[in-house]
Amino acid sequence: MKVFGAQTDSWQDLLAHILKTQYGISPLPELARTKEGKPYFPSLPALQFTISHSKGHVLCALSRRPVGVDIEEIRPRRESLPRYALSPGEYADYEALGADWPAFYTLWTRKEAWCKYTGQGLAPLWGQTPPEDGLFSRSYQGDGWRAAVFGEEEPPKEVTWLEGEWE
């Protein structure tokens, strides 16, 4: 599994750059979506990918197995959101982490990455806690953002951030 990030508004440009430099694939292959909306490459069934973007940050994970990623800008929201959006177990973790917005987004990005991993989207998994057994997840953090990846392969310890050389 590889996880890349960049400050950009174009996830397609980032994905095209990663495929070209990491896999020798150019141009960007045709994209399709499952009925649930998860993007994939019909011509590259052995390569799974997932994209997330938030306020000028884009994160992309690639793997030979299903994978999900999420990145979110940390911003205050309705005070009731954590209790509404998190499962009881996640809410207990939220309180243990300090019950602040960075703690919420650490847990929320993990949940969203899990939902993207499953390919089902958020609605069918609302109120559930991502499983711990047999799968891998890792959380990442930076100035003003939180992110997570979820999948069947061990994620890298850090995101590989691409600077302006690829644009």
Kindly give the residue locations of the regions a language model identified.
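Core catalytic alpha/beta fold that binds nucleotide/phospho-ligands
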Residues: 1-167
